[in-house]
């Protein structure tokens, strides 16, 4: 197993320009009259386009049923891709020694004030971007009910744009109540398969039933074999996992990102058929 050592500094509460992100003057929920999505813009805070500012409380975790500062099961984590974009292969120990650049899950914007209100067509991708010390947007949390929360924006979680379908991209989206059956809730639930022995997973080789085209299908579960993968349990007819796009792949675009250029190299993450050996599907959690 590759040992990934990262030196991480962390800042909280202030933006890159020194302003207080939690200021009561932040225009929560307001429409932005000066927005223009028809010309190029970047992920920088003074360029990124916002059609409507996010709702009040988006930066706060105090509405949860736990006290975040005292939570003993909350884990702040960076998810590093094990795919080396320099060699187009899986990272090796030698690659790490040489200092080849690691890409980690990050936002498509550079400052958390750029989080948008939940409007279709303006969804915001979670991208792979180079590791940057002090960037709080690269921190996530293992949350209850198989959800993955942005540490800097606790009301936003991993989601799949348009549902758990092949090629659909990973986004952030407002967190549904964990026990809710509201539409889209199951798209916010994922299984990170830790590299424990397969037999340690009680689900392995168990069966589940589902209906497809009016017929009952019995499926044998195999997802514990996809070590260090994010598995999408919502789909039962096919095993889907997160997968990073290649540098040569095109991007999925919509109104909110068709003219976006990130200030660093970035790659989308999509739902793809699971492969135990595909390096672009392997993610290493680095706890901090």
Swiss-Prot record:
One of its GO terms (molecular function) is carbohydrate binding. The keyword Disulfide bond applies. Its main location: membrane. It is a peripheral membrane protein. The keyword Endoplasmic reticulum does not apply. GO terms for cellular component: plasma membrane. It holds the Pfam family Gal_GalNac_35kD. Glycans are attached at residues 205, 261. It comes from the Eukaryota. Keywords: Cell membrane, Disulfide bond, Glycoprotein, Lectin, Membrane, Signal. It is found in: Cell membrane. Residues 1-15 form the signal peptide. Coiled coil: none annotated. InterPro entries: Gal_GalNac_light_su_1 (IPR035310). Light subunit of a heterodimeric lectin; the heavy subunit binds galactose and N-acetyl-D-galactosamine of host glycoproteins and thus mediates adhesion to host cells. Heterodimer composed of a 170 kDa heavy subunit (hgl) and a 31/35 kDa light subunit (lgl); disulfide-linked. This is Galactose/N-acetyl-D-galactosamine lectin light subunit 1. It comes from Entamoeba histolytica (strain ATCC 30459 / HM-1:IMSS / ABRM). The gene is lgl1.
């Amino acid at each position: 197993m590759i040992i990934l050592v990262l030196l991480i500094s962390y800042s909280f509460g202030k933006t890159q320009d020194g302003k207080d992100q939690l200021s009561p003057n932040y225009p929560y929920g307001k429409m932005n009259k000066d927005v223009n999505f028809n010309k190029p813009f970047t992920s920088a805070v003074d360029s990124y386009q916002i059609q409507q500012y996010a709702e009040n409380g988006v930066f706060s975790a105090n509405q949860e049923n736990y006290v975040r500062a005292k939570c003993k099961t909350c884990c702040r984590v960076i998810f590093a891709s094990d795919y080396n974009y320099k060699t187009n292969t899986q990272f090796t120990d030698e690659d790490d020694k040489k200092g080849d650049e690691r890409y980690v899950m990050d936002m498509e914007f550079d400052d958390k004030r750029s989080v948008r209100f939940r409007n279709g067509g303006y969804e915001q991708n979670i991208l792979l971007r180079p590791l940057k010390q002090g960037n709080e947007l690269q921190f996530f949390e293992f949350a209850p009910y198989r959800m993955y929360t942005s540490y800097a924006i606790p009301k936003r979680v991993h989601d799949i744009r348009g549902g758990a379908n092949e090629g659909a991209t990973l986004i952030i989206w407002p967190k549904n109540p964990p026990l809710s059956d509201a539409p889209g809730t199951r798209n916010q639930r994922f299984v990170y398969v830790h590299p424990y022995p397969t037999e340690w997973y009680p689900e392995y080789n168990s069966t589940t039933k589902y209906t497809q085209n009016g017929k009952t299908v019995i499926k044998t579960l195999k997802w514990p074999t996809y070590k260090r993968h994010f598995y999408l349990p919502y789909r039962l007819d096919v095993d889907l996992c997160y997968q990073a796009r290649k540098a040569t792949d095109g991007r999925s675009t919509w109104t909110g990102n068709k003219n976006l250029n990130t200030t660093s190299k970035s790659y989308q993450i999509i739902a793809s058929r699971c492969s135990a050996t595909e390096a672009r599907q392997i993610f290493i959690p680095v706890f901090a």
